[in-house]
Design a protein with these regions (language model features):
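Phosphate-handling substructures
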Residues: 61-139
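Glycine-rich phosphate-binding loop signature in dinucleotide/nucleotide-binding domains
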Residues: 35-37, 137, 141, 147-153
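Gly/Ser/Thr-rich loops at beta-strand to alpha-helix junctions
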Residues: 46-48, 162-165
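Acidic, low-complexity terminal tails and accessory targeting/binding regions
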Residues: 73-87, 91, 144-155, 166-234
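Active-site-proximal alpha-helix that buttresses catalytic centers in soluble enzyme cores
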Residues: 2-68
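Amphipathic alpha-helical segments that form well-ordered structural scaffolds
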Residues: 32, 52, 125, 129-133, ...
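Short glycine-rich phosphate-binding loop at a beta-alpha junction
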Residues: 39-45, 145, 155-158
Length: 234
């Protein structure tokens, strides 16, 4: 199975949709995704993800399914006065990596500012929802790998968000959440491809074979917009 994690196009956050530039990105994305021969399409319930997704769904004549658990993590807040950002996934990497010990997969929730019981609980909810979603697609999570219950070669796309997408990737790839947040970025309309790598008939392991790909923007002559990058993008 191939899983495509797609961030929505350039957002109009105030109106929960996408900007005129975002519509151009979504159209270019749809042209690219028609070549991927998708079997199923899913989307966050939020307008900017739905409006991005619709271009691809229309191009492929596929019905989409809304997955509420893939909505953006709008309650995951950081201390604006202390860190200069409002969202927890935007905490500067210099803070995360500045101590003697960096967060690991098993203890990230013990490090400030992530040592909030509610944050850990909400992350575990996303992990549980992810596991249930993938089980419906034939892969059962066992530890950090997936048992092939009903393996297949389908290609499925999930249109979602920057913060959520990185958070989901940390679970799929068994990587420390704060290190993923501070080490990667998903541009608007970018496509991240995760192959469920089946080296045996019993097990599959998620393997990222394409991260934050924006080739459709290059092809269309559109710029990458730095939504989520705080400084010195140019």
């Amino acid at each position: 199975m191939r899983l495509y994690i797609i961030r929505h196009a350039d957002p109009d956050y105030e109106n929960n949709t996408i900007t005129p530039e975002g519509h151009l990105e979504a159209k270019a994305l749809a042209r690219r995704m028609t070549r991927e021969k998708l079997h199923k399409i899913y989307a966050s319930p939020m307008g900017r993800a739905q409006h991005t997704m619709q271009y691809t769904a229309d191009a492929l004549k596929l019905k989409s399914t809304t997955e509420n658990w893939t909505a953006e993590l709008e309650t995951w807040r950081a201390d604006q006065n202390k860190y200069g950002v409002s969202m927890i996934w935007d905490v500067p990497g210099e803070k995360i990596r500045g101590g003697e010990k960096v967060p690991h997969h098993h203890d990230w929730h013990e490090h400030d500012p992530f040592n909030d019981a509610k944050l850990k609980q909400e992350y575990e909810y996303i992990c549980a929802q992810s596991d249930a979603f993938l089980l419906r697609h034939g892969y059962e999570r066992k530890g950090h790998r997936y048992r092939c219950v009903k393996p297949h070669q389908e290609r499925i796309a999930v249109f979602c968000h920057g913060g959520f997408g990185l958070t989901w990737l940390s679970h799929l790839l068994a990587l420390p959440l704060p290190m993923v947040w501070s080490g990667f970025w998903l541009p608007p309309s970018s496509v991240t491809t995760v192959l469920f790598d089946e080296r045996s008939k019993e097990w599959a392991v998620p393997r990222c074979i394409g991260m934050a790909d924006c080739s459709h923007l290059y092809e269309a002559g559109l710029p990458i917009r730095p939504r989520g990058i705080k400084t010195n993008f140019d």
